[in-house]
Design a protein with these regions (language model features):
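Active-site acidic/histidine proton-transfer and metal-coordination neighborhood
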Residues: 81-123
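N-terminal pre-domain/capping segments
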Residues: 1-97
Length: 123
C-alpha cells in the first residue's frame, strides 16, 4: 500500500501522560508517539502558531525513522467569513503560518475551522 493511502492513528496534542512519563519538550513527541504504537500526531496550534520552523524540522527528523506523520491544527480564531477585513486577512496569515509549520514537520494535512457565517446570510 502506498504511504499516501496508509491508515494512520495518532493523537491530537499531548495528554497529561506526556509529562507524567517524563517528557518535557516537543522534540520528544516522536518518541512519545512511537512508544504508544502510534504513527501520526496532530500538532495543536489552537491558540496560535508558536512552533518555530527550525524546531519543527528537528521534530520531522526525529519522527522520520519512526514513520510518524504530522498534521497541524490551525488556530481556532480563524474567521474567513468575518465582516471585518482585518480579521479575514489575519486568518489568511494564520493559515499560511500553519502551512509553513506543517511543511517543516513533513506533514501533509492542515485542519482548520473556517468560521460561521455570523451575521451574514447563507444565500
Amino acid at each position: 500500500m502506498s504511504d499516501d493511502w496508509k491508515i494512520r492513528f495518532g493523537t491530537a496534542g499531548t495528554s497529561d501522560s506526556f509529562a507524567a512519563q517524563g517528557y518535557k519538550t516537543s522534540l520528544e513527541v516522536p518518541e512519545y508517539t512511537a512508544k504508544m504504537g502510534l504513527n501520526a500526531f496532530e500538532y495543536q496550534c489552537g491558540r496560535g502558531v508558536r512552533l518555530g520552523l527550525d524546531k519543527a524540522a528537528k521534530m520531522a527528523a526525529f519522527s522520520a525513522p519512526k514513520d510518524i506523520l504530522f498534521s497541524v491544527h490551525a488556530p481556532y480564531y480563524i474567521s474567513m467569513s468575518s465582516l471585518e477585513e482585518d480579521k479575514r486577512l489575519n486568518s489568511i496569515q494564520y493559515l499560511l503560518q500553519s502551512a509553513a509549520v506543517c511543511r517543516a514537520l513533513g506533514g501533509k494535512r492542515i485542519i482548520f475551522h473556517s468560521g460561521s457565517c455570523g451575521k451574514q446570510s447563507r444565500e
